[in-house]
Amino acid sequence: MDVRIVDFLETRVAVLEHHGPPELEHQTARRLVQWRLQHRLPPDRHRTYGVHYTDPRTTPPEQHRVDFCVSVDEDVAPNPEGVVTKVIPGGRCAVARHLGSRANVSAAAHLYEVWLPKSGETLRDFPIFFHYVNVGPHLQDRELITDVYLPVR
């Protein structure tokens, strides 16, 4: 798997937080998609991210946590949907590309379990995050592209 080091630019994001079982993530993501449509934030101009605070392989389902995000130019106004403003910090990141289904993004495990121990790099104080390069109901699993970012010093 090809891993490269990039300088990620600080990115303001609109966030809908998911707390709970991984198998219910699609419900949270769907709510963010609806909010995104209402606010006219198309994916070709506003990137889609997932900030993964826990590993669903090792975390009890009730403690699992992911932020589903859309890049925005301005802070999000208070709203009934619970979408809030956060920032994905800028800095060095190791990046690996995952092609295919997002049900099991193997690039994340590769970065942590294979690449990191051999790299000589150390982690920064921000969790792994995914850039969902292409999104939409018209895409087949085999067409999905996900860039996985691991913040390093």
Predicted regions and their residues:
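A solvent-exposed interaction/effector surface
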Residues: 1-153
